[in-house]
Amino acid sequence: MLKISNYNDLRSSMSPGDVIAFGGKGTFSEIIKWATRAPVSHVGVILQSKLFYDDKSQPGFFNQIIESTSLNGQSGVTITRLSDRIDSYDGEIWLLPLRSDLKQKMDKKKYYDFLIHQERKPYDMPQAIKSALDLIDDAVSPGVLTHNLEDFSRFFCSELVAAA
């Protein structure tokens, strides 16, 4: 886990499938960190876009993040330039690179196709809350109260990242 203090220092080492983790300072972020016993309150995943001019590919790329969150008046799955997201974030940010063996096996076409088709899907607050309570699945009525069924009609942040 690499802490991001300067985006430009890590920009070129980022690649599709890498996870960006956020440790927010707000009340909801603090509740998430307390419930999960982790410094991370939110995650998203890297998309990279090539540069085009006059329908011709140009050298270079820009990093984007796809995430399910409430941001800029929208709630749900959004795609944002990663540099803009980092510049406007109040809290800690980490890069979690995808293991190299998994990068080699990655089917980028399926990865991009899946994620692009999730944009604008709503945020899944009920499942987000249930996921934070997964620790008690086996203690109280195993899985009955907090078990989440796979449902890709809406997403919370880590559900989107895991599905990718």
Residue locations for each model-derived region?
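Short aromatic-glycine-enriched beta-strand elements
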Residues: P59-Q64
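N-terminal capping segments
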Residues: L2-S41, Q48, I66-S70, Q74-A164
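Short, conserved beta-turn/loop elements at beta-strand boundaries and strand-helix junctions
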Residues: S49-Y53
